[in-house]
């Protein structure tokens, strides 16, 4: 509804599970749904031993996965601008929070708990998050 009305729609999305993305891409393309007012905030990304995002071409890279399996498969005239695809950035740890707040919050949040019960790599019993739980 928001998108059809030309309003901004903000999603928080995981990379796992990934089964929804082929259906999403197919529907966007078949129904010609413009994502020009849509923002995707990915919850997490792997870092290497130097606390840098792993290589984009790695099969483990969430940025790479989203690019290859989602954004590249959506028709160019429908896909959102690259600046509307937000990932955690170790150089700017508040980027997600500040950008999300600047947009007025999220409209939709999908999550996929990891095998330990974590969400966005935050373990359920992490002491540093106890006050926020």
Predicted regions and their residues:
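Short glycine-rich or small-residue beta-strand-to-loop segments that form or flank ligand, phosphate
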Residues: 10-14, 41
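Glycine-rich beta-strand-to-loop/alpha-helix junction loops that act as flexible
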Residues: 13-18, 111-115
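Active-site microenvironments of hydrolase-like enzyme catalytic domains
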Residues: 107-111, 116-123
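Ligand-binding beta-strand-loop-alpha-helix segment within the catalytic cores
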Residues: 34-110
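Class I SAM-dependent methyltransferase SAM-binding "motif I" and its flanking Rossmann-like core
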Residues: 120-133
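N-terminal glycine-/serine-/threonine-rich phosphate-binding loop
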Residues: 1-11, 29
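Short glycine-/acidic-enriched loop or helix-start segments at secondary-structure transitions
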Residues: 22-24, 50-52, 120-122
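Glycine-rich loop at the start of a catalytic domain that most often binds anionic cofactors/ligands
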Residues: 18-33
């Amino acid at each position: 509804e928001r998108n059809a009305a030309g309003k901004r729609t903000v999603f928080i999305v995981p990379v796992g599970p990934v089964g929804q993305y082929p259906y999403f891409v197919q529907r966007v393309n078949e129904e010609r749904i413009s994502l020009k007012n849509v923002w995707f905030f990915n919850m997490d990304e792997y870092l290497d031993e130097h606390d840098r995002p792993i290589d984009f071409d790695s099969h483990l890279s969430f940025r790479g996965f989203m690019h290859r399996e989602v954004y590249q498969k959506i028709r160019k005239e429908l896909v959102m601008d690259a600046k509307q695809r937000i990932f955690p950035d170790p150089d700017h740890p508040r980027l997600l929070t500040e950008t999300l707040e600047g947009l007025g919050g999220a409209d939709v949040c999908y999550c996929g708990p990891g095998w330990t019960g974590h969400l966005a790599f935050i373990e359920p019993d992490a002491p540093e998050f106890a006050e926020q739980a």
